UniProtKB/Swiss-Prot annotation:
Motif (AHA): 261-270
Spans annotated as Hydrophobic repeat HR-A/B: 111-177
Keyword Transcription among UniProt keywords: yes
Gene (UniProt): HSFA6A
An annotated GO cellular component: nucleus
Database matches in Pfam families: HSF_DNA-bind
Domain of life from the UniProt record: Eukaryota
Native species: Arabidopsis thaliana (Mouse-ear cress)
Subunit architecture: Homotrimer.
Function description: Transcriptional activator that specifically binds DNA sequence 5'-AGAAnnTTCT-3' known as heat shock promoter elements (HSE).
Single GO term (MF): DNA-binding transcription factor activity
DNA-binding region: 17-111
Protein name per its UniProtKB record: Heat stress transcription factor A-6a
């Protein structure tokens, strides 16, 4: 008796697609999440529109994790390629809408231990290089910090010296202005300076002559020395105070020593400023 036995389906002999591919296909096919992930317009790729939401909602349902980067790495191992630089769009020639049976043609890439070792060595090399760069930068910043500390210390020392000089100057002035003879000497020199300026103006005016309606200025060589002898100008404030203080009696040795230390160095006043100073104290 002959029996017509059924012929086994050819598909039963083939290896089914992996669980990862099947689950990924199901996620993309789910129309309820099209706003998160869906097929592209040409149905030959899929797009993850909202990666964060995809990781929080879709991945835990099928893969029991919410790591989007891990999902992308898995796609790479199955030959998927990211085809758009501005969005998360992936494609594989056998991953097509309505063609689930083609999933069996997608194979996982076999990675040898040597390839993995080389990859790890490359990562280790990059980490070491980054570490060396950080160490160099750290040394540079520390040196800069020390330089700034040194600069600040020098500025503090200069400030202290300036404050001491100012205090010594004020103490010296307070002692001097209490003595009438000192102020009289300053007034006398101030009046002499005013007189010198007036004489200078007279000398300049007297040497100008009218020549055919034009004012002719005399050459400075003819009487430049006389003008210099009669003119005042800018003088060192410390020298004036020193001279004035020496002109009256009763100056102590400590005051002379204070003046000789150079506390007046850098304090320069014009005759007009000296006049204002004298008028202020008198």
């Amino acid at each position: 008796m002959d029996y017509n036995l059924p012929i086994p389906l050819e598909g039963l002999k083939e290896t089914p697609p992996t669980a990862f591919l099947t689950k990924t296909y199901n996620i993309v096919e789910d129309s309820s999440t099209n706003n998160i992930v869906s097929w592209s317009r040409d149905n030959n790729s899929f797009i993850v529109w909202e990666p964060e939401t995809f990781a929080l909602i879709c991945l835990p349902r099928c893969f029991k994790h919410n790591n989007f980067s891990s999902f992308v790495r898995q796609l790479n191992t199955y030959g998927f390629k990211k085809i758009d630089t501005e969005r998360w769009e992936f494609a594989n020639e056998h991953f097509l809408k309505g063609e689930r049976h083609l999933l069996k043609n997608i194979k996982r890439r076999k990675t040898s231990s040597q390839t993995q070792t080389q990859s790890l060595e490359g990562e280790i090399h990059e980490l070491r290089r980054d570490r060396m760069a950080l160490e160099v930068e750290l040394v540079r910043l520390r040196r800069k910090q020390e330089s700034v500390k040194t600069y600040l210390h020098l500025m503090e020392e200069k400030l202290k010296v300036t404050e001491v000089k100012q205090e010594m100057m004020m103490n010296f002035l307070l002692k001097k202005i209490k003595k009438p003879s000192f102020l009289q000497s300053l007034r006398k020199r101030n009046l002499q300076g005013i007189k010198n300026r007036e004489q200078k103006q007279e000398v300049i005016s007297s040497h100008g002559v009218e020549d055919n309606g034009k004012f002719v200025k005399a050459e400075p060589e003819e009487y430049g020395d006389d003008i210099d002898d009669q003119c005042g100008g800018v003088f060192d404030y410390g020298d004036e105070l020193h001279i004035a203080s020496m002109e009256h009696q009763g100056q102590g040795e400590d005051e002379i020593e204070m003046d000789s230390e150079g506390i007046w160095k850098g304090f320069v006043l014009s005759e007009e400023e000296m006049c204002d100073l004298v008028e202020h104290f008198i």
